[in-house]
Amino acid sequence: MKQYLDLMKHILAEGVDKSDRTGTGTRSVFGYQMRFDLSKGFPLVSTKKCHMRSIIHELLWFLKGETNVAYLRENKVSIWDEWADENGDLGPVYGAQWRSWPTQSGDAIDQISQVIAQIKSQPDSRRLIVSAWNVGELDKMALAPCHAFFQFYVADGKLSCQLYQRSCDVFLGLPFNIASYALLTMMVAQQCDLALGDFVWTGGDTHLYSNHMEQTALQLSREPMPLPTMTILRRPESIFDYQFDDFELTNYAPHPHIKAPVAV
């Protein structure tokens, strides 16, 4: 994906060197946007191999409302292990906020069910929003939400989605985030009988870690391949009934995987 490589080049050319919570150090820019037309292919980075199985299982885990890594470990997905406690718990991270945002009255709001109902009944609403940034629970989370807020938009029978990501690890995290929200948009569009529009990614502190520079240079030396195709093989009764085998990725011919350390 040329947009992704252009972002890397922009950070290297225009970014500033900053310290960070992990102590690793970053080169960072503030405020960047990319747009992907989902009708023209699935936006999965091809200049290194991305682990689509982990992306799918993580998204299904979010949609289940789970915050313990047991499901992920059962499916050989380890991307959250560094932040889990000895019992596998992460606190009220994404799944909890998406599916059971606590209210002052002691109830819980299922934001995913709510936004899908709103898309169906009020497609022109400007409130088609899901937020994971619950200020009152941030101190209980193993990791504050990086992809914090997303909004749907319906026009001409097409569903688009914009994500605001307050903090973005461009080398390791961003390929996952783009693919995950593109897939979520496909699922919601199917549930709402809408065609695919755009996925718009907006980044806040958008950075390359200082120990990812060699890997970034290698990736920039590679030529992007044509976008693959993601097919949803069946239509479940609800957004919560999708299973891993419902998704088929074809024509994905990436360059080899590039290993890099995770900043914890």
UniProtKB/Swiss-Prot annotation:
GO cellular component: cytosol
EC identifiers of the protein: 2.1.1.45
InterPro entries: Thymidate_synth/dCMP_Mease, Thymidate_synth/dCMP_Mease_dom, Thymidate_synth/dCMP_Mease_sf, Thymidylate_synthase, Thymidylate_synthase_AS
Main location: cytoplasm
Sequence positions that bind dUMP: 21, 126-127, 166-169, 177, 207-209
An individual GO BP term: methylation
Intracellular or extracellular location(s): Cytoplasm
GO molecular function: thymidylate synthase activity
Binding-site residues for (6R)-5,10-methylene-5,6,7,8-tetrahydrofolate, renumbered to this chain: 51, 169, 263
Known catalytic reactions: dUMP + (6R)-5,10-methylene-5,6,7,8-tetrahydrofolate = 7,8-dihydrofolate + dTMP
Residue positions of the active site: 146
Free-text function comment from the UniProt entry: Catalyzes the reductive methylation of 2'-deoxyuridine-5'-monophosphate (dUMP) to 2'-deoxythymidine-5'-monophosphate (dTMP) while utilizing 5,10-methylenetetrahydrofolate (mTHF) as the methyl donor and reductant in the reaction, yielding dihydrofolate (DHF) as a by-product. This enzymatic reaction provides an intracellular de novo source of dTMP, an essential precursor for DNA biosynthesis.
Known partners and oligomeric status: Homodimer.
Family, as annotated: Belongs to the thymidylate synthase family. Bacterial-type ThyA subfamily.
Name under which the protein is recorded: Thymidylate synthase
Organism: Shewanella baltica (strain OS155 / ATCC BAA-1091)
Lineage: Bacteria, Pseudomonadati, Pseudomonadota, Gammaproteobacteria, Alteromonadales
